[in-house]
Design a protein with these regions (language model features):
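Solvent-exposed interaction patches of small proteins and small membrane subunits
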Residues: 1-113
């Protein structure tokens, strides 16, 4: 089983990939199906990694909506055709920046422990 620090790094790697794929803006995202699929895939990775974190660690960082992250992953995996591109874009723009900042802090604090 992978350690929590590795799962957190998986999350950061996925966020970095999403940032690269979406750097050209909303219009490019809307026009490029491959980018849409790749972004959704990386959101799935984030949800999978979050799902593997211990309850203790998630409780220490309760400001993160862990349950929503995992729930979105479940929708992506099991009900893919319900995924709204507007919602995906909103997650990328509004939710990933604070998640990235918190996960970076988590990695740093775990490294210091």
């Amino acid at each position: 089983m992978r350690r929590e620090a590795e799962r957190l790094q998986d999350m950061l790697d996925a966020i970095s990939a999403i940032e690269r794929y979406t750097s050209q803006g909303r219009q490019a995202f809307d026009e490029q199906e491959l980018v849409q699929v790749w972004v959704v895939h990386h959101l799935q990775i984030i949800g999978e990694a979050a799902n593997s974190l211990s309850a203790d660690l998630m409780n220490q960082y309760a400001e993160v909506p862990w349950a929503q992250i995992v729930a979105f992953r479940n929708i992506v995996v099991h009900e893919y055709f319900r995924v709204s591109l507007n919602l995906v874009w909103a997650i990328v723009q509004n939710n990933l920046p604070p998640l990235k900042a918190t996960v970076e802090r988590m990695v740093q604090e775990l490294g210091e422990a």
